[in-house]
């Protein structure tokens, strides 16, 4: 039996799964505008605060605390979304901890896994540089790492406090002793990283760090829905697919941005499929919107031409898999550089 804590519970029961509905975490999304430059300019501190808020809300999911107090498990799998406090799940249950991350291997994960740092050979995601890095770029790499490490150190007391707040009562109710945060944080059995040599720097990894970039891509891509297939078939010049993903919503763009985008897209000789979350007035005839689109099916279609996105690691492997041409519009802190 697997207990699955998810913000997207299935409509029907699944054999062998005990579902805990964590959709309460989605309540924070309307208050988070990734197009607001005040948030973007906060850089990674904004992202880490967002991650901690998600961790706090997840603990409020109905049935989660009971599962932690009364359940018996052999391992814990968590996805790391910039919140180190989730180390508490395995610490409370006293079982091996398997962690999945959403980005490539970075110095903070090297530190957590006690691996030799690659600062002199591998550019940070904030440091676009050729490889091998020239001296000034290596110096810049070290400086940026020092700044990021200092920023995390300044927030460490917040992390420790939240770790104790969320997990100390659960550990006490279970009858176990919550270990100090460092003991829990470094006790990772396996780390899966969202990385692959096709889009990330080659680097040495310890045996318990495994690259799984592109794991979410299905080998058998389903056909397009009939309405989209008919649309692509009737587009002799081809189709441009425009998507900002799920967190960064096109509907939240400023009005002037949406107006200018419609003007530019309307002048193109291509059909444009735009993932847009609400109705959009004044659309040119060649611009078609949907709140959701089967992007893998679109990118693999012979009529597809260009994929416009914000450099998300969930989106790029799909485009690499089919050899899609990408036009990147970096926006969120981890993609803007």
What residues fall within each predicted segment?
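Catalytic core of nucleotide-sugar-dependent glycosyltransferases
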Residues: 1-337
């Amino acid at each position: 039996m697997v207990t699955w804590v998810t913000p997207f519970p299935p409509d029907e029961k699944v054999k062998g799964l005990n579902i805990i509905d964590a959709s309460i975490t989605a309540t924070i999304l309307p208050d988070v505008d990734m197009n607001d430059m005040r948030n973007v300019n906060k850089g990674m501190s904004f992202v880490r605060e967002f991650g901690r808020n998600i961790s706090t809300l997840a603990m409020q999911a109905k049935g989660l605390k009971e599962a932690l107090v009364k359940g018996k498990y052999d391992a814990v799998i968590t996805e790391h979304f910039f919140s180190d406090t989730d180390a508490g799940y395995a610490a409370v249950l006293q079982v091996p901890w398997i962690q999945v991350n959403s980005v490539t291997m970075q110095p903070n994960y090297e530190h957590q896994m006690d691996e030799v740092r690659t600062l002199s050979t591998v550019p940070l995601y904030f440091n676009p540089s050729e490889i091998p890095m020239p001296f000034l770029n290596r110096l810049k790499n070290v400086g940026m790492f020092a700044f990021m490490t200092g920023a995390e150190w300044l927030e460490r007391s917040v992390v420790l406090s939240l770790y104790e707040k969320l997990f100390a009562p659960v550990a006490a109710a279970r009858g176990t002793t919550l270990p100090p945060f460092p003991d829990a944080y470094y006790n990772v059995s396996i780390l899966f990283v969202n990385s692959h040599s096709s889009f990330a720097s080659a680097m040495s990894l310890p045996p318990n760090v495994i690259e799984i970039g592109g794991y979410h891509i299905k080998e058998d891509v389903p056909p397009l829905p009939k309405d989209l297939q008919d649309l692509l078939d009737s587009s002799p010049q081809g189709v441009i697919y425009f998507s900002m993903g799920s967190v960064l919503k096109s509907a939240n763009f400023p009005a002037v941005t949406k107006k200018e985008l419609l003007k530019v897209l309307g002048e193109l000789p291509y059909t444009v499929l735009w993932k847009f979350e609400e109705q959009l007035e004044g659309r040119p005839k060649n611009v078609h919107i949907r709140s959701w689109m089967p992007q893998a099916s679109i990118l693999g279609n012979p009529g597809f031409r260009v994929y416009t996105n914000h450099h998300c690691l969930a989106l790029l492997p799909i485009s690499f898999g089919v050899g899609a041409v990408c036009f990147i519009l970096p926006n969120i802190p981890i993609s803007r550089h």
